[in-house]
């Protein structure tokens, strides 16, 4: 992906085609820290796209009225990677996933029920950060996938 990054504080993001990447520099053991940090980034700095339900008539319906099979709303794959240096931090990955999904909801997709694939991993890296990759799996018409995520390395 060669798109330019938009940055505000410790958060940066970019998008191209059906992929959005979000990175947060640094780590903390408090998962709740990430939600307001990412929300602030999207509120103050992000000028990229937002999820769309299509026509005005479609927007009038509640998300709970959308089909759960992804038809009309699209399904997504989300990969969350915690890169650390030295000893791994004591942070429950399920709490991290919930905080990140809550933070990007409304920016990458409408509702976390649209997430059909979720991968959360902790790994040693060159610098401490949280890296999130969101990919659209199905078209707005519920058709064939745009991208299939390769198997976990």
Annotate the PLM regions.
Residues 1-153:
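Acidic, proline/glycine-enriched N-terminal capping motif
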